[in-house]
């Protein structure tokens, strides 16, 4: 799955007078490592590095990074509050109708996190199970589409708030509140110290 940085089609930055740089405001949740996270006051991650590199030598633009909840990033771009969204966004046709995407910067498969001793190899295996996702994400769209088209018991989808990070969802699995959660496969290496998760 290609992971990209996106911007609103035709969205304009804050206007400045002649000779002054225009500000490009970049929205991120700062909680999607390794793509976007904060170290002290510094914005770090692949997406952040990409944006910084693009505007590094610009005489016309300066970049301002803003941390905001995930579910407010694209609405902020739509309203003109932000010009770029940099948050491990994946490409889909619906988004492509509204936003301009960068070239892909990474590729990874989805991975399922579940309690130790369980194994799922397809979406069909998730029939009747319970998971938790952020609304508007590709994970949510994938599950919603499966529920709409599958001839099996639907997957129960709980929609988490933007403040519910992956570590919290993993805790919910450990507590038995959830059956499983989704992430990118390469992110599993960062979870290697978490016990009772497969």
Task: Name each model-derived stretch.
Residues 29-30, 106-114, 185-189, 193-198:
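Periplasmic-binding protein-like
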Residues 4-8:
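C-terminal motif of bacterial Sec signal peptides marking the signal peptidase cleavage site
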Residues 72, 87-97, 144-146, 171-198:
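A ligand-binding cleft/hinge motif common to bilobed small-molecule-binding domains
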Residues 52, 64-125:
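Acidic, polar ligand-binding/catalytic clefts
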Residues 38, 51-60, 139-163, 192-196:
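Ligand-binding cleft/hinge of the Venus flytrap
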Residues 25-30, 37, 44, 124-141:
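Short loop->beta-strand "edge-of-pocket" segments that line small-molecule binding or catalytic clefts
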Residues 10-12:
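Bacterial signal peptide processing site
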Residues 17-88, 162:
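Extracytoplasmic small-molecule ligand-binding "clamshell" domains
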């Amino acid at each position: 799955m290609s992971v990209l940085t996106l911007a609103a089609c035709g969205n304009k930055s804050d206007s400045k007078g002649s000779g002054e740089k225009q500000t490009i405001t970049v929205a991120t949740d700062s909680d999607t490592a390794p793509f976007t996270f904060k170290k002290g006051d510094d914005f770090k991650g692949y997406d952040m590095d990409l944006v910084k590199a693009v505007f590094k030598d610009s005489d016309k633009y300066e970049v301002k990074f803003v941390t905001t909840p995930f579910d407010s990033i694209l609405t902020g771009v739509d309203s003109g509050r932000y010009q770029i969204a940099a948050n491990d966004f994946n490409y889909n046709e619906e988004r492509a109708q509204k936003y301009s995407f960068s070239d892909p910067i990474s590729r990874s498969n989805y991975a399922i996190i579940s309690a130790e001793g369980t194994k799922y190899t397809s979406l069909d295996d998730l029939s009747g199970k319970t998971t938790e996702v952020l609304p508007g994400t590709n994970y949510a769209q994938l599950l919603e589409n499966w529920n709409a088209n599958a001839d099996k018991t639907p997957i129960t989808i709980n929609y988490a708030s933007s403040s519910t990070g992956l570590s919290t969802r993993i805790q919910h699995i450990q507590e038995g509140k959830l059956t499983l959660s989704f992430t990118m496969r390469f992110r599993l290496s960062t979870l290697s110290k978490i016990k009772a998760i497969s």
